[in-house]
Design a protein with these regions (language model features):
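Ligand/cofactor-recognition surfaces for anionic moieties
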Residues: 1-736
Length: 736
């Protein structure tokens, strides 16, 4: 982040902006995150302290904020009598640090909160920027800020909506990853953002390392022997022992193991972090060249590589600051949508009237059958998570998959516009209609209202279809809901669930991040409370927590598609927040039975369906434990260690929500990042606080009984954690 920020500030200064630029990236990081932070007990430098009396006098929405957070100045980013503005003034530019949502100090509010407002600190931050510093423009630097997720209408925001209240009429320029058009669209709709796209980290083949290399060599020897060779049994025993050492357990035959080794070796992984304003090296361009030729022709790849050589992202930012027109471009990931380059442009999404496309319907049908073949019998009900991002980038592939499972297709009017759903006859379908319990991200709900109504229509029509109940699981379950709950069939047929209007996420990830939960049922309750709103034929929502709980009892397995090559299920917390959250909710609803969880992968080449355990093992093998993944991250210093910590925290999130993480993975993560003295020292020097969190997450996994190391390992881990804690206390709060 700070390397990118430094490059942007340097370019702005060269264009005439009055900026007091430090001499280096490290100095910039220190004065922003360190500075006087120790003096005030804050996590970053304090620009200014705003007294509580000033907040009371100047906050126009004080009553609404106090109803949620109590009297000003509140407890967030506060000394009890005032609020701190964090960041650093650099001449005519302020590098500000957006305050947190505020739930971090009281995570149980995630379960019970009915309304919401930003904290005193959050509102004061934006008011200070507008009225005191008098900014001419905001540049939100990097996606996943909190502003666009504040309460209010999903589109056409007004003075009653918090995004409008906070940003006012100040232009909003937003630097955003090119592969996330869905959340970028949300920022456009709710904060009037002009998006400036940037590339995601370059990708590289994972390759093999340490024990994996030796294992592959042994398997090659085994495959070259004749079936009657006396050495074959000895090699087979050796292979099994070697495979255990590198956590290969899920294979039936040596040939199956061989395919899994090749899958690991060929997997694409992020190679470090993307830096705004830095040219791609020749080595990384060669990596791009290698895997792009798998799906694009020679001429296309050559043109693409020429575009990648050009630095356009900083210019996009400065052009926007100068009030120039920023050319639009569809968003997507580089492998599937090479037209996203050159970046530095204003990404947009799709044509909602034609989603899912015909191609997506064909692909979705094939993927649905592949998923069903993974399970031993036809499932009665499937819990499927649908995000906006992967559907926008794939023209609705996941939507098409849900429709295919239900035995339905989209209905289009004479103008080719989506207008509902139609059922496929059972004779054409050739199998039972699978009941699909769909939980949507808040972004899907906001950006794809036509598709929400289409999915609701498909479930409703299937519920009304006069068909044998053993061939129509949707109708069978609807009739049972109707009888057991004494509700009308229209309510009993509801299958599309999400947050209430204006709310986002299940908040399970917030509980995991703060470690402030006692047992897994709290996670299930939080998910149900947040996602218990059903969306019907008219697209409107009603609170249906009891119906959701009833539907969860019937679920045989949970499923979600991967969003992109770059973002695995252990890379970001969104996956366990949604898929993990509903899996835990199913377990509570059905009385404690753990259900299978599957991951669909259509990001590259032939589609695949893996169990969650297989997916986590693959990602841990190719990313977390792979020097080719973590060594480039460490070259980015502070931020790289934070990424490693996030990977381990997300792994813990899967243990908490599904219990489907191999305990041995924690052994290997401990050995790699904490028990190795040289690695521990390096992590601590680069980011003391994040390195301590790595050790504490591993200890938390033990304390929550997700992993039981031997006593020597546990003692060494505790000793390492104590050493890291001493380091943090020794360097003080200014360390970050």
């Amino acid at each position: 982040v700070f390397e990118s920020l430094y490059n942007v500030l340097k370019s702005m200064r060269n264009e005439g902006y009055e900026i007091e630029l430090p001499k280096s990236t490290n100095e910039l990081r220190e004065i922003v995150l360190g500075g006087n932070s120790g003096k005030y007990g804050q996590e970053a430098n304090v620009i200014e302290r705003i007294d509580g009396s000033e907040i009371v006098e100047n906050e126009p929405y004080l009553k609404e904020i106090e109803e949620v957070w109590g009297s000003a100045p509140g407890k967030i980013q506060s000394d009890g009598t005032g609020v701190f503005i964090l960041g650093k003034k650099l001449g005519n530019v302020v590098v500000g640090i957006q305050p947190t949502f505020g739930y971090e100090g009281d995570p149980m509010r995630l379960l019970f909160e009915k309304g919401f407002a930003p904290t005193h600190a959050f509102s004061t931050f934006y008011r200070w920027m507008r009225n005191s510093f008098k900014v001419d423009a905001f540049l939100h630097f990097g996606m996943h800020g909190a502003l666009e997720f504040m309460p209010g209408k999903k589109v056409g925001t007004s003075s009653k909506c918090w995004p409008d209240r906070l940003i006012g009429n100040v232009p909003n320029i937003y630097l955003y990853a090119a592969n996330n058009p869905s959340e970028a669209s949300l920022a456009k709709r709710r904060t009037n953002a002009v998006i400036i796209s940037h590339l995601t980290p370059p990708l590289a083949k994972a390759g093999l390392y340490k024990g994996l290399i030796e294992l592959k060599e042994t398997v090659i020897q085994y495959r070259e022997l004749a079936d009657d060779d006396s050495n074959k049994k000895k090699l087979e025993d050796l292979i099994i022992d070697q495979a255990k050492l590198v956590n290969f357990k899920d294979f039936d035959t040596i040939e199956n193991l061989w395919l899994k080794i090749l899958e690991s070796e060929d997997a694409l992984i992020p190679d470090g972090l993307h830096i705004i304003g830095a040219d791609l090296s020749e080595e990384k361009l060669k990596e791009y060249d290698g895997y792009l030729r798998e799906s694009h022709n020679h001429q296309e790849v050559n043109k693409l590589l020429e575009k990648l050589k050009k630095q356009t992202e900083v210019k996009g930012i400065t052009d926007a600051l100068n009030g120039q027109f920023i050319r639009p471009v569809p968003g997507g990931d580089l492998i599937r949508s090479p037209d996203i380059v050159p970046t530095g442009r204003n990404i947009h999404a799709f044509d909602p009237f034609r989603m899912p496309s015909l191609f997506a319907m064909k692909e979705g049908e094939q993927q649905a059958e592949l998923l069903l073949s993974k399970h031993e019998t036809y499932p009665n009900s499937v819990a499927m998570v649908l995000w906006g991002s992967d559907n926008i980038k794939s023209d609705g592939l996941s939507i098409a998959q849900a429709m295919a499972l239900m035995g339905a297709v989209p209905k289009f009017d004479d103008y080719g516009r989506l207008c509902g759903a139609e059922l496929i006859s059972l004779s054409d379908l050739g199998r039972p209609r699978i009941d699909v319990l769909m939980t949507l991200s808040g972004i899907f709900r906001d950006l794809l209202p036509l598709q929400v109504r289409m999915l609701a229509s498909a479930a409703y029509k299937a519920s009304l279809a006069e068909e044998p109940l053993d061939m129509n699981f949707i109708r069978a379950n609807t009739l049972k809901h109707q009888k057991d709950m004494n509700i009308d069939i229209k309510s009993a047929a509801l299958r599309v669930f999400s947050n209430a209007e204006g709310a986002y996420g299940s908040n399970v990830s917030h509980l995991i991040d703060t470690s402030s939960w006692d047992d897994e049922e709290e996670l299930a309750d939080t998910f149900n409370n947040r996602k218990g709103f059903a969306y019907g034929l008219d697209g409107k929502c009603t609170k249906q927590s009891e119906l959701l709980s009833s539907a969860l009892k019937k679920v045989d397995f949970a499923y979600q598609n991967l969003e992109s090559v770059e973002l695995g299920v252990t890379t970001i917390d969104h996956y366990f927040d949604t898929l993990g959250g509903i899996s835990r909710a199913v377990k509570k609803a059905n009385g404690g039975d753990t259900i299978p969880v599957y991951i669909g992968d259509q990001t590259r080449g032939d589609a695949a369906v893996r169990t969650l355990s297989e997916q986590i093992n693959l990602e841990t093998r190719t990313r977390s434990l792979n020097p080719k993944w973590f060594e480039p991250l460490l070259q980015h210093g502070h931020e790289g260690v934070r990424q490693i910590e996030a990977q381990i925290t997300n792994t813990l999130g899967w243990s908490a929500t599904t219990g489907q993480v191999d305990p041995d993975l924690y052994d290997q993560l401990s050995e790699t990042f904490v028990l190795d003295e040289e690695m521990r020292r390096k992590l601590s020097e680069l980011n003391p606080k994040a390195s301590l969190r790595v050790a504490n997450r591993l200890l938390e996994a033990h304390e929550r009984d997700y992993w039981q190391p031997d006593q020597d390992t546990l003692d060494a881990l505790r000793k390492g954690a104590d050493e890291l804690e001493d380091k943090v206390e020794g360097v003080g709060l200014a360390a970050e």
